């Protein structure tokens, strides 16, 4: 990102439109739940009684409707935090077409995959905020963006080594050596495709929400299986973990104002105009008061992992760029995440200060080589929005997973959806012997449970 581009994009006089006056606004997409929940019984709405923390109905796919790999899914709406369930989910088969160099093909989404195509699978969770629109758009769009990005690099993915020139030309005899020295492999092309797909999807959401005068954003957690590897891409505070008999491995990191403090402070240091004189970029252990003026107090800036002391000046009394701790930390007093999709129109309350310049849509991607795992029958990946992780730790989830799968009917294709439902029940305040006193999550909760064993020995299709 160049400084010139950034200034044109975000600083005064840039292309972001001013907030529109209040009035009736039509959503760019109708509200709906994931398509694979059709026929599951419960309607999207819920009565007041069913929105109580301990009485909210948990939804999962109807029996007879299976997801890729017999993966399990379950969800529950929030306890009257918002009118709608702002989470969304998507899953399906990815069909990546190989094409001859120079042939331009249409962009229609394919549902039938001839054997000569590279195929994979896709699971995604989107946790919306400021309304459900951004999450719905992401669920409808991101897989198509990813397919296009993968098709742009598929010839490099299937080559023994990605060529310097996709056309196959060798302009410089040392080109293969340069690629080898950089350590570029097929998985790097998949990672790049995921990063570009997130950015493309973010642009689409921005255009759609701007056209309808809407605001809103969402986090995105995606798992993609291609060529024997599982790619987990995360932008936000959802989480994925691998649960095995004797191992728990976290496959994603949460991106919050706290975890990305230095990046956010660096941006405010480079472009102080973004704070409009209303915020201080410095971090202090607590919000400073007038009595702190002239005193030396603990602080840290963008270049610091540790702490030091400074004498408090009047400008230090402004509201902090990042305020609060843990789940309560907020960026510009507004947003609890630092990465995600959307939020192009989001401003600090009663100001023209934009949050989008501080947000990244680019995910962190973790690669799990499934074929190198010696996968056992009860090995699963659990993906969930933050409503689950607010009340259950990785260890508690792993304990529940192992307890459920031991002795449960192994030939039941819906047992992983039952497992996902059980995990959600453990966020509804019900005491469970495995986890102790039941805690309550008032948030929307969505969970995928992806079994690895059935695919561990299966090669990717071409």
UniProtKB/Swiss-Prot annotation:
Q: Which residues form the PPM-type phosphatase domain?
A: 100-452
> InterPro entries annotated for this entry?
PP2C, PPM-type-like_dom_sf, PPM-type_phosphatase-like_dom
What segment(s) does the record annotate as region Disordered?
A: 1-66
Disulfides per UniProt: none
**E.C. number(s) listed in UniProt:** 3.1.3.16
Concerning SUPFAM superfamilies, the annotation shows: PP2C-like (SSF81606)
Gene Ontology biological process: protein dephosphorylation
- GO cellular component term, pick one: nucleus
Q: Does the keyword Manganese apply?
A: yes
- Protein family per UniProt: Belongs to the PP2C family.
Q: Which PANTHER family match?
A: PROTEIN PHOSPHATASE 1M (PTHR13832:SF236), PROTEIN PHOSPHATASE 2C (PTHR13832)
Q: What is this protein called?
A: Protein phosphatase 1M
Q: What organism, scientifically named, is this protein from? A: Mus musculus (Mouse)
């Amino acid at each position: 990102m160049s400084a010139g581009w950034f200034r044109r994009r975000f600083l005064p006089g840039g292309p972001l439109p001013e907030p529109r006056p209040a009035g009736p606004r039509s959503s760019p997409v109708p509200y709906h739940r994931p398509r694979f929940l059709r026929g599951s019984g419960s309607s999207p709405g819920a009565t007041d009684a069913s929105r109580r923390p301990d009485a909210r109905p948990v939804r999962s796919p109807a029996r007879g409707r299976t997801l890729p790999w017999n993966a399990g899914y379950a969800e529950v709406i929030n306890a009257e935090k918002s009118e709608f369930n702002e989470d969304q989910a998507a899953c399906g088969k990815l069909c990546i077409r190989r094409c001859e160099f120079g042939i331009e093909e249409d962009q229609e989404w394919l549902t039938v995959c001839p054997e000569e195509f590279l195929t994979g699978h896709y699971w995604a969770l989107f946790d919306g905020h400021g309304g459900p629109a951004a999450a719905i758009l992401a669920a409808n769009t991101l897989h198509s963006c990813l397919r296009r990005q993968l098709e742009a690099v598929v010839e490099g993915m299937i080559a023994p080594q990605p060529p310097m020139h996709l056309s196959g030309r060798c302009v410089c005899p040392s080109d293969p050596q340069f690629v080898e020295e950089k350590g570029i492999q097929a998985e790097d092309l998949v990672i790049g495709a995921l990063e570009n797909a997130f950015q493309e999807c973010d642009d689409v959401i921005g255009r759609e929400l701007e056209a309808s005068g809407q605001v809103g954003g969402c986090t995105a957690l995606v798992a993609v299986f291609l060529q024997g590897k599982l790619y987990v891409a995360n932008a936000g505070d959802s989480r994925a973990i691998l649960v095995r008999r004797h191992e728990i491995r976290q496959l994603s990191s949460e991106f919050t104002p706290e975890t990305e403090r230095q990046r956010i402070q660096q941006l405010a240091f480079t472009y102080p105009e973004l704070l409009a004189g209303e915020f201080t970029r410095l971090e202090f252990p607590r919000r400073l008061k007038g009595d702190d003026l002239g005193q030396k107090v603990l602080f840290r800036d963008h270049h610091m992992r540790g702490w030091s002391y400074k004498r408090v000046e009047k400008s230090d009394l402004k509201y902090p760029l990042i305020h609060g701790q843990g789940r309560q930390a907020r960026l510009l007093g507004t947003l609890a995440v630092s990465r995600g999709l959307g939020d192009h129109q989001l401003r600090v309350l009663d100001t023209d200060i934009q949050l989008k310049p501080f947000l990244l849509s680019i995910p962190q991607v973790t690669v799990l080589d499934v074929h190198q795992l010696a996968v056992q029958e009860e090995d699963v990946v659990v993906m969930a929005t933050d409503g689950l992780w607010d009340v259950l730790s990785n260890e508690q989830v792993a304990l529940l997973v192992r307890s459920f799968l031991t002795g449960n009917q192994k030939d039941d294709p819906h047992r992983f959806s039952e497992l996902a439902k059980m995990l959600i029940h453990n966020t509804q305040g019900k005491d469970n012997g495995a986890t102790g006193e039941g805690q309550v999550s008032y948030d929307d909760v969505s969970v995928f449970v992806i079994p690895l064993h059935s695919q561990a020995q299966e090669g990717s299709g071409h």
